[in-house]
Structure formats: structure tokens, C-alpha cells
Amino acid sequence: MSEQTINQTKTNTVQKILFWTMLASIITFVAGLIIYTCSYWGHMFSDFAETLSYCIVKNPYTGEYGNIHSIYPPFAFLPFYLFALICKPALTQYIDGTITLEQLAKTPSFIISFLLFYAICMAIVLLLSAKMSKFKGKKLVYLLVSIFCFAPFAFCLFRGNNIIFACILVMLFFMMYNSEKRWQRELANVCLAGAAAVKIYPALLLIFFIKDRRFLDLLKTLLYSVILIFLPFLLIKGGFANIKEIWNNFTHFNGGEGRDASWNNIGFDGLASKIATLLHLPVLHSILSKLFRFGSIIVTIVALCLSHNSKQKMQPVLITLLTYELFQGVSYAYTLVFLIIPIIIYLVNFEEYSKLNKIYYGTCFAVIALPVMAGLNFFLFAQLSAVCLLVKGYIDLFKEYSTLKKEKKLETPQTNEQTEDKAETIESAEQQN
């Protein structure tokens, strides 16, 4: 069989997988949209309305404007200012309590603002996905439709959460991180800093600089992050005094009653809460939460540092993103939208994986991707799949490191023997002369 025929067979396999994925995604997406619209209409676009509200008040941190207590630094919502202007009169009524969220969601100006924002963001995500995958023809179409229907994306759409902005920045970071062009690598640093300024936890991706011994890039990205996080406070009434307010709002939000037990909270804290409730041992909640969260941080750092010379392309990205997503005290399911990146890597390098890894990773990704779960607002299976993916990523990286270490030990005696043989040959030649 010729090499061209083999490559064609590999392409057809991925194309078939994407076709059936797309078909299942479309059907379950429509079902999920109908269910969510009927069951949670009063909460539709709640996050988007909240983000836009931050843009039109003088201070979104102190609570002086109704129930507005932002947990995000200004950079996270300032890019939404133009979208807020489109529906400013309706937003003002919403903030004053004149109209409800449900009424706001029916306002034409708000709908236009939302559709415009999501059309732009979705177009960018799909364009970046196409560039990352380098797929063409039917395969590209199947991929893009599947991404559009991806459950975390659907949930993000239903809520109108601004995490899509952070997702775009992280995608740009990974696209340009290893670029041969210096300006692109520098832009990657800025993108990561921007992602950290939107949702602070992407700062965990700084570990990649440590893994690859790129300490100058690490320092520059930290500097960019500080600038993007703190400098925009000067544009807000109260300036840097709001830093204390944002911290109080953040701790209050994470400690909100019932958030840890929510079925759409996919974080380790939520998992610990469910285990403690199941065993009727409330004391276990805090212990397990700290063990899972900080244990994952330590293991991820060790795994990444040991994978400096790794040939694995997906696993380092996967475990870092999952650690970021699962570590958060309150981590709603839309945070899994970042898995678009490792899923694309998985599909691009599909034939390089063993049969076990193809099935294992594919099954876990499929469970997370099922859009109907977004409609049901139920992500327990996605949560368990995310944990399974994290554990498998650890196993693959540590296993590879162990194998490489053994191979290196086996090569060392051979090298010594070759050196000794060479020395004997030289000595023999000198005696003959």
C-alpha cells in the first residue's frame, strides 16, 4: 500500500469521526437549546447583562449601583463598552430595577448587542480553530460545526459569559507561543497576560515558560499582566482603592451558599462537596477540596517540568488547562470551552495515538461535548470526564518520562564501551607507528 493511500485512509477516519460528531452535536444542540430556553429563560444572557452593566456605571465594585459587585478587574469588561452603548437605555432601566432580566433579554437593542458580540467572537474562534487544525474541505466544515455546538460553548452562549474573550486570547497564545517570528512570540506573551487579566486563573499557563526555560518571556508576561490588571483601575471611579473591593467581592462570590454543590460547577471544590454529601460527612468537603485543588497544581507543575523533551503534543496543554478549570472554587461548565484547543490537537494527531488513547480521550471529549447537557444545566458527567482526562494526561506524561529515563540509562553503558574501544584502537595504532 502506497504512502499516499495510507494518508488518505487516515484522513477519511478523522473525517468520519467528525461527520458523526457533527450530526450528533447538531441534534443535541437543538434539543439543549429548546430545553434551556423553556426552563431557564429568566436566566438567559444573565452574565452578558451583568458584564455590560459594569461598563456604564462609574464604579462596579462598591455596590453603590444596585446589586453590582464585580469580581473582575476593569480589563475584563472594558472591551465590552461599545456593546453596552448599543443598549444603554435598557441597561440603565435594568440597573435601576425598573425592568427585570427577562424583560431586558426581550429588548431589541439588547438582543442586537448580544448577537453582534457573539457573532464577532464566534467568527474569531472558528477562524482560529481552522488555522490551528489546518483542515480543509468537508473535514473543516464538520469541525467548525462541531465546535459551534460544543456543550461548554452552548452553555456559554445561553449565559452570555465573557469567558469567550479569554478563550480567544488563550488560543492566540498557543498559536504563536513557538512561532519562529519574534513579534508573534511577543504577542503571545501579551495575549496570555490579557487572558489572565480577564480570568486570573489562565496565569497558570506561565508554567509553560518554566518548562521550556524561557525565563525572560516569563518575566515579560508577568510585567504585561501587572499592567493590564492594575493600570485600567485608573479609568474607574476610586482608582486603586477598588483593589480591596474586588478582593472582597471575589471571596464573597466563591463562598456563596450552594455554589459548590451546583450541578454546573465542574471544579474540584464542587466534586469534593458532592462526595462529602454522598458520604454524609460534611467535614470531608474542606479536606478533599484542598487536597484535590492544590495537589493538582503540584502534580501539574512537576509533570510539565519533566516533560521538557516530551513528544506528547496534547497532554501538556490538556493537563494545564484542566488544572486551571478544576482548581477554581466556583468553576461553571463554560470554563471547559478552553478544551477546544486540546481537542483540535487530538484530532490533528489522531493517528499517532494508541488504540487505547484514541478511545479513552475520544470518549471523555465526547461526554464533555454533548450539548444537551448544557440545556439540562447538568454537568456531572462532564465533571467526571474532565477529572479522568486530567489523570490520564498525568499517566501518559509520567510514563513517557520513565521510558525516556530508562532508554538513557541503557545508552550510557554502550557509549562508555564505544569510548573504550576507540581508545584501544588509538593506542594500538600508536604502538604500530
What is each PLM-predicted segment?
Residues 2-180, 184-186, 215-334, 340, ...:
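Primarily membrane-embedded glycan-assembly and transfer machineries that use lipid-linked glycans
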Residues 10, 193, 287, 318, ...:
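A general, composition-driven signal for non-globular sequence regions
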Residues 69-76, 345-433:
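Aromatic-enriched
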Residues 168-179, 208-209, 213, 217, ...:
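Transmembrane alpha-helices and membrane-interface helical segments
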Residues 185-209, 320-327:
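Membrane-interface alpha helices of multi-pass inner-membrane proteins
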Residues 200-212, 222, 336-338:
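Transmembrane-embedded, aromatic-rich helix segments that form part
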